[in-house]
Amino acid sequence: AEISRDKSGFFRLEKILPGASWSKSLRSPLAEPGIEAKVGEFIVAIDGVPTNSVKDMYSLLVGKADVPTEISLNSKPQLEGARKIVISPLEEEYSLYHYNWVQDNIKKVDKASNGKIGYIPDMGPEGLNEFSRYFYPQLDKEGLIIDDRANGGGNVSPMILERLSREPYRLTMRGGSVRIGTVPDAVQVG
């Protein structure tokens, strides 16, 4: 989350990053179901300690990564009337910021190309796994932007080229349809 210090000394939520609840490192504690934190609210206490009593709110979170922590939120910069929630803070937010940057780029490319072009990010340390995470959901695109500006190098590129140069081994087409695809439109089980 992005916060700013209010003239009252309490800290205001300026931005809450969306997360991906399927990944422990990409979850966003203030955006998790049931938390209902809102931009504009004030973090007025952490584990009962008023945030206006410290210079740096983050000092109250030292050693609290992945530990249930009570946060008091209020629409006003005051303790009275605050509601208490329990979150498990992240150790770092870099992964969450990077995930949101990638999601924003996917949306921009999709919008600019009317859904015809996909976007695959720089594939950091997870390399081919990260490539697969973004490649396979975009198989139906006419083209791909593979953004490797921040890639540190290595042996991933030949593996990516191998995936990109594969020929379809089967095609599907419904009777009377003009649409041909490499993936089924539906699966019937049972």
Listing of model-derived features with the role each one plays in the protein:
Residues 1-25, 111:
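PDZ/PDZ-like peptide-tail recognition elements
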Residues 20-30, 44, 49-190:
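Cleft-lining beta-strand/loop regions that shape enzyme active-site pockets
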Residues 40:
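Conserved catalytic motifs of ABC-family nucleotide-binding domains
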